[in-house]
Curated annotation (Swiss-Prot):
Every LIM zinc-binding domain range: 352-411, 412-471, 472-538
A GO BP annotation: transforming growth factor beta receptor signaling pathway
Protein name (database record): Zyxin
Lineage start: Eukaryota, Metazoa, Chordata, Craniata, Vertebrata
Main location, first listed in the record: cytoplasm
Compositional bias per record (Low complexity), positions renumbered to this chain: 27-45
Transmembrane segment boundaries: none
Biased composition (Pro residues): 102-131
InterPro entries for this protein: Znf_LIM
Protein role: Adhesion plaque protein. Binds alpha-actinin and the CRP protein. May be a component of a signal transduction pathway that mediates adhesion-stimulated changes in gene expression.
Length: 542
């Protein structure tokens, strides 16, 4: 807390707070809920004043302590009489304000609020760079930090005509801003922004969006993109209170305000006081809510851009009577063309395969047997039944229906049924595969060797030899082919049949050769003898 012997310090703090009002909209600052202590010395007390150093209760005295306009300080005090205050110790505001209790709510206002500024400032842009102060005091614009006396220059010619009529009661501030993250590079003894006065906090809390009117001596100011309607003025304030600025800061002050405020101030017939629990975070959030007209205009522009594409959906609208009639005429014409196609002469190569007449491309035709036929020409060769879309059979390049084709099929020689599936041809006859078997053992002969007899009956090889093969004159067995062979080997001598193994000499049993040599057969009186036995029997007979 500042020393009671430096009243000029309080006066400077008040002016600095009002000038640096845009710093409250810095969204990066975090403020703790603290209450400012009661001042021991009246900040407006000068050498000739007799006011008490204690804060007055809510009434006319409190109204004189409330500063409603930027730069409203007593006329008798000038900037030359105010010495530079010492900087407050770091963390002082947080230490003594944490134990203070909240005061009771203020009584109803008896007088109206001061007049609203002539121009409302928009909402703040991104947070400004950190300044050299440690609270919500004056934020020195760029280029004005080189000298200590520059912030005090615009305070020399300031009038305070509307300060006594300010109806705002001075109750203690709830929040005291923390020092900014970046500290000043100047030494603590040269800091020109002291701690804020206790009566400045209620004004900041009750009028968070109150804007500062621009000085009349300024030239042309840059206009903002979005200018909201001005706040309705209060009837109890004086419109003539102005704050003339020094030439050195006249161009910097409005520029900083125009660049930091972009949201409109709340408009109404009378500004209502905010409750004590109104925080700086809420003050920062309100301009964001009022920035919604800008995206609304963009959305309206987008709708206007999309409107041309959304207007012409005429295709989805119902057809008119004229369009319906045109569609009906086109449909009737199409159906007539389909029912009565125009005659088209066919090429000379496209001839009917039966009547040899030309085919029209518009007439239906049947392609079968690698030829084109008229529908009426493609019929059964036997019964002349139309075969379009029906199953037919090709017999010698002639179409037959199923019934007529069955009459042309072969009949099985065994079962006497028509062969419509697989057929076997043997001995000049047709057989079903299952019907072509041996007549003796009924073994299927499909794919096997068979022999037919004189009655044209098929026999397997074994049954045929057993039934028709010659028999051996020695063993009386049928002479059959050896196993694994298809040829039958037999020896015929003296009109007799012999197996090879049975062709021997009857007297000595010596195998005889089939050749005409000395080992061959020398028959005698119907006996098969070898040469030796033949000689013996011949000598005996003599």
């Amino acid at each position: 807390m500042a020393s009671p012997g430096t009243p000029g310090t309080r006066m400077t703090t008040t002016v600095s707070i009002n000038i640096s009002t845009p710093s409250f909209y810095n969204p990066q600052k975090k403020f703790a809920p603290v209450v400012a202590p009661k001042p021991k010395v009246n900040p407006f007390k000068t050498g000739g004043t007799s006011e008490s150093s204690q804060p007055q209760p809510p009434g006319t005295g409190a109204q004189r302590a409330q500063i409603g306009r930027v730069g409203e300080i007593p006329v008798s005090v000038t900037a030359e009489e105010l010495p530079l205050p010492p900087p407050p110790p770091p963390g002082e505001e947080l230490s003594f304000s944490s134990n203070c209790a909240f005061p009771p709510p203020p009584p109803p206002f008896e007088e109206p609020f001061p007049p609203a500024p002539d121009e409302a400032f928009p909402s703040p842009p991104p947070p400004p760079p950190p300044m050299f102060d440690e609270g919500p005091a004056l934020q020195i614009p760029p280029g004005s930090t080189g000298s200590v006396e520059k912030p005090l220059a615009p305070k020399a010619h300031v009038e305070i005509s509307s300060a006594p009529r300010d109806p705002t009661p001075p109750f203690p501030s709830k929040f005291t801003p923390k020092p900014s993250g970046t500290l000043s590079s100047k030494p603590p003894g040269l800091d020109s922004t002291p701690a804020p006065a206790p009566w400045a906090a209620p004004q900041q809390r009750k009028e968070p969006l109150a804007s500062v009117p621009p000085p009349p001596s300024l030239p042309s100011q840059p206009t903002a993109k979005f200018t909201p309607p001005p706040v309705a003025s209060s009837p109890g304030s004086k419109p003539g209170a102005t704050v003339p600025m020094a030439p050195s800061n006249s161009t910097r002050y409005p520029t900083s305000l125009q660049t930091q405020f972009t949201a409109p101030s709340p408009s109404g017939p009378l500004s209502r006081p905010q409750p004590p629990n109104f925080t700086y975070a809420q003050q920062w959030e309100r301009p964001q809510v009022q920035e919604k007209p800008v995206p609304t205009e963009k959305s309206a522009a987008v709708k206007d851009m999309r409107r041309p594409t959304a207007d012409p959906p005429k295709g989805n609208s119902p057809l008119t009577m004229k369009e319906v009639e045109e569609l009906e005429l086109l449909t009737q014409k199409l159906m007539k063309d389909m029912d009565h196609p125009p005659p088209v002469e066919a090429a000379t190569s496209e001839l009917c395969g039966f009547c040899r007449k030309p085919l029209s491309r518009t007439q239906p035709a049947v392609r079968a047997l690698d030829c084109l036929f008229h529908v009426e020409c493609f019929t059964c060769f036997k019964c002349e039944k139309q075969l379009q879309g029906q199953q037919f059979y090709n017999v010698d390049e002639k179409p037959f229906c199923e019934d007529c084709y069955a009459g042309t099929l072969e009949k099985c020689s065994v079962c006497k049924q028509t062969i419509t599936d697989r057929m076997l041809k043997a001995t000049g006859n047709s057989y079903h595969p299952q019907c072509f078997t041996c007549v003796m053992c009924h073994t299927p002969l499909e794919g096997a060797s068979f022999i037919v007899d004189q009655a044209n009956q098929p026999h397997c090889v074994d049954d045929y030899h057993r039934k028709y093969a010659p028999r051996c004159s020695v063993c009386s067995e049928p002479i059959m082919p050896e196993p694994g062979k298809d040829e039958t080997v037999r020896v015929v001598a003296l009109e007799k049949n012999f197996h090879m193994k049975c062709y021997k000499c009857e007297d000595c049993g010596r195998p005889l050769s089939i050749e005409a040599d000395e080992n061959g057969c020398f028959p005698l009186d119907g006996h098969v003898l070898c040469m030796k036995c033949h000689t013996v029997r011949a000598k005996t007979a003599c």
